[in-house]
Amino acid sequence: MSLVISHHTALWMHCSPKFASSAAVANYIEGPINASVTGEKVDRWYRPALSELTGIPLADLGSVDYLLSRDVARHPSPLSRPHSWCGPLPDRTLLSLGNDIYLSAPKFTFLQLSGRYDLVELSCIAMAMAGWYLPSQGENGLSRHNPVVSIAQLKMPVCDIGKHWGIDKVERATRWALDNSRSPMETSLALLINTPRIRGGYGLVSPILNARIYLSAESRVIYPHRYCEADVSAPDSSLLFEYLGKAFHKEEHRDIRRELALQREGYQLQYVTIRQLLDPPQRNEIMRRYAHSAGDSLEPPTELIVRKRIALLRRLLPDRGLVLEDGGVIQSLPGWALPIAWS
């Protein structure tokens, strides 16, 4: 009998600063395994082993998600949550951690989570996994990690995984998701830009997130770095969109020099705040400028699209009353946020 870590626990292991590097070098297994472990064994033996493996105290580990074969009875406890999988586990979707413990690979983890969240939330999860952050219960509300998977890898071919019920949902959720996001606001802005109009977005050319702009020797005299990263930009555009959040004023001098260096390279910066995105006239002007930079145009929305857009905005952006004067946001964390012990 083996322990197959799944769902939220698998996501946290891949993205936790305490374990992500170990998960990244774990080896795939080729053959099937016996996923018929008992709940008693998970609680008494595997949880202590997992605590030792991750360095997280047993009392802080939380409830562990794990997979069982469909024909095995599930008996959840306060310490563990069993989930069933229909049919044999697919090849090369599990990573061996030793001691008969296996971790669901990133794309398999994402497929498991497809049954828990809607398309908008799944797109946000995909961009967090393929980006550099995960919402966290820690002090800053974000935990940093290297990308654990690419969006292309999440768009798994059906032949890799079989005709599982979540495949269509995964394909739809990753259709407009992008790599390389560094924050929830970059994710929200990107999804607003390229989600189709009929789903509430603006249906514009897909942006590039955090594109590297290498500086000339002359510009490096102004801003002594090899390159700058632009938060959001259209392909081959000289207009760069920068999210202006709470942290902006902490390095004001550095950002002024950075902006001057980028201007010398021929780029123009358009700053975007959360309050602007919440204000329809300002948001539409930002989208109009993005469309123009991409060689596109902004079409007026129909009544149906307006209703869809309001619904999408409610999913992607906080309520206006939760935005603080300094740009901070009072917002509840999603169910997939990294627990504080894992941060």
How would you label these PLM feature ranges?
Residues 1-165, 301-303, 310-343:
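Short gly/ser-rich loop at a beta-strand->alpha-helix junction or flexible surface loop bordering the NTP-binding
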Residues 147-343:
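Surface segments flanking catalytic/ligand-binding clefts of nucleic-acid enzymes
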